[in-house]
Swiss-Prot record:
Keyword entries, A-Z: Aspartyl protease, Cell inner membrane, Cell membrane, Hydrolase, Membrane, Protease, Transmembrane, Transmembrane helix
Membrane topology: Multi-pass membrane protein
GO cellular component: plasma membrane
Pfam families found in the cross-reference section: Peptidase_A8
Name of the protein described by the UniProt record: Lipoprotein signal peptidase
Role description: This protein specifically catalyzes the removal of signal peptides from prolipoproteins.
Amino acid sequence: MNNKKDYYLPFLLTAIVIVVDQVTKILVVQYMSVNEVIPVIGDLVNLRFVYNTGAAFSLGAGFGEIARKILLVFLPFLLLIALTGAYLKSAELTRAQRWFICGILGGGFGNLIDRFFRSEGVVDFIDVKFFGILGMERWPTFNAADSFIVCCGIGLGVNLILQGIKQKKLKDS
């Protein structure tokens, strides 16, 4: 990529995601009690303060302390460093792909900050009704970092699929 602004500007999103994630978590910890529920949109969306000692859906919460540190701190840290390195080395990424990757990085580093500095676990607080889909009445509680990881991950996946379709059409014509 020739334009340095297009190359480095997406890291601003990484910083914004980290700030939004940490500020929302600080507010939840300061103004809510653990397990407190505050309805936001009826029963559809609640604020529910919980600490998550596992990964997504609390996976790994029952692991021993050393296993949790390796699987939930060390490995994610290495993956985020590898993703950052791939971003910095690749000239093939599109502008959109760079923004999506930086959103994922922001969410990943936001949750890692909790794992490093909150012994209780990652602060989760967004609780959404799931209407019994997949046998779940409510989706597992999550946070702003998780939202950015999922939304940017989906955006990146869709972008890569569309790019592949476009390249195939160009190759076939």
